[in-house]
Amino acid sequence: MNIKLDYSDVSFRKDGKLKLLIIVGTRPEIIRLAAVIKKCRKYFDCLLAHTGQNYDYNLNGIFFRDLGLEDPDVYMDAVGDDLGETVGNIINCSYKLMSACKPDAMLVLGDTNSCLSAIAAKRLHIPIFHMEAGNRCKDECLPEETNRRIVDIISDVNLAYSEHARKYLHECGLPKERVYVTGSPMAEVLHSNLPQIEASDVHERLGLEKGKYILLSAHREENIDTEKNFLSLFNAINAMAEKYDMPILYSCHPRSRNRLEKSGFVLDKRVIRNEPLGFHDYNCLQMNAFAVVSDSGTLPEESSFFTSVGHPFPAVCIRTSTERPEALDKACFVLAGIDEKSLLQAVDTAVQMNLDGDYGIPVPDYVEENVSTKVVKIIQSYTGVVDKMVWRKF
């Protein structure tokens, strides 16, 4: 793997504005940050760096196109042969990049390995702003839970989605004056793309009838890489195909595809494996599905948003824990687990309640449409404060 370590040609415009470095590496980060990236590019001297954590075009490139984003200014190509090498490369490449371009502040979102670039920023005394801070599912089997703790603790300003998340941050001993509840950035992204989502012709292209298919996404490490969980989940998926006797469109990520091929597991013929879909197509499929069965972290946010705009869908989360309890507070989705009995019961319940018009209530923090404005103003407000009070730069 040819890792890019020379960033001597990378520089900000030096136009007098605050110099902000945003680092991403995965599809969910790109989606959630889309509106924030655009706003930061407008008001800051902004560089966008991609670690290369998800290298597949269908997982990354297509979303830059769909969301109207410019390509990253820097591509690190930091993926190694194993987890240890990848994490080391991300920190090393980030350190080299920040040493070369000297940002005033850096912004990361979420709990991916790419967020561990914040470690480099901390050692270089660069103020760190962390969106999606404070999310906790209290499940140690999730690698993301470790990343959350690390990045929350070392960040200078944590931007939480909800009061639940703020509470978790306070329990960690973080100072309340460095924690803000901004709400989720997803509504801003979804609302600005709603016309394209509604206009998608994905059903015609895939030969699907609206309301007569189940949309499936299963890709999380704990569901795919753990043998017991993998077999439990995919046996349950086959049982779901047999019970409902309709197409199950499986948006199949590389991790899942490789695991299925290696295991030799035979999916029911009604389960249709498809390459990961674009942003507009996937959301159009969601809002017209008989049910959406997914282990994606954004499912509760998407369900809440589409309910708020009159496109509710039965949302079933194939996990045993959630870091978004505020969405359960408002009944935006059903937590199903990964065994056959629990999954089938959860789908039945979610579908029937949707038919009865019992949709739950949109989460107030998930329908905020000025999150990007909040983020820009908080970064502008606190970069100097961190420089003075934490690093004593002046």
What is the meaning of each model-derived region?
Residues 1-246, 256-394:
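Nucleotide-activated sugar donor-binding and catalytic core shared by glycosyltransferases
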